[in-house]
Amino acid sequence: MFRRACLAAIAVCALGLTTAAHAQGYKEKVKEFRIGLLGGENTQDRLARYGKFQQLLQEKLGIPVKLFPAADYAGVMQGIAAGQLEMASFGASGFAGAWLDCKCIEPIAVPQENDGSTYYYSVLVVRADSGIKSIEDMKGHSLAWADPNSTSGYLIPSATLKAKGIKLDDGAYFSKTGFSGGHEQGVVAVLNKQYDGAVTWTSGQGDAAEGYSRGNLRSMVDKKMLKMSDIRVIWQSGKIPNGPWAIRTALPDDLKKVVTQFLLDLPKSHKDVYDDVERGSGIGYAPATMELYHDIIELRTAEQRANRS
């Protein structure tokens, strides 16, 4: 009987050690967790928005968490593909492009708007005093895209305009087009009369006078860079799936589970941090699936074919 008790105790201890080792397993393989921050906002503001997020995730993982702000969307996409970043919050098009490039990432969480939806909108904005009130009025005027890998800042509006028969070459319809370097920069260029119009993103929900509930316009209003009375929205897209938090597929499963649960819990445990990261309000994150981005991946694939032809 004593022997059976000893064997039972040894078994329990062994199970405990195995469980503990499994729980800490990813720490032996992953010494630091690197997060890529998309361009489109000045570096200081990006690092400030993610500072508390970085600290909380580091406490949860028990390994160093580092932030890497990229100059543009492509920098984050390339960092993920090269294994130099573990995770990033992508736009839908950026995620689709990164997935098409390396097939090495998977979506884990997607922001939900205040009504529980997981969609947002692309909008075209002009100065309120410009006299421009429609896409038709934009003929002969200049248009700023945000970034070639932005969903709302390029992919969707350019595809929509092409579907209307509008040619995007300089002088064909618009006097000129160009990439501003990001959403924030595009709106600033309009305010400074460097471009007549710019495309950016918004939740399309909430008080329009405050820049809506979430998005670039809301962020700029909150930072006192913009008064909504100074601009006019002349076009809005159809629904676009919110971009996901995506993580490298090759990472240990236990690490991916901890990070995913951290994101899902964040709005309840630290709503202020969630609002900082997502640039406005929302009810939280939902689990993300590849299915949500199927149409965007198809659109990116078609764009790549067209560019090669």
Where do the protein language model's features map onto the residues?
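Pocket-lining segment of extracytoplasmic ligand-binding domains
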Residues: 144, 148-252
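A structural signal for short loop-to-beta-strand junctions that line the ligand-binding cleft
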Residues: 105-117, 230-235
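Sec/Tat signal peptide C-region and signal peptidase I cleavage site
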Residues: 17-23
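N-terminal export leaders
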Residues: 2-8
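Bacterial N-terminal signal peptides
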Residues: 8-16
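Beta->alpha turn/N-cap motifs
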Residues: 69-73, 83-102, 110-111, 183, ...
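Bilobed "Venus flytrap"/periplasmic-binding protein-like clamshell domains
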Residues: 35-60, 70, 93, 117-188, ...
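An extracytoplasmic/periplasmic, membrane-proximal ligand-sensing/linker region
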Residues: 26-37, 41-52, 216, 247-309
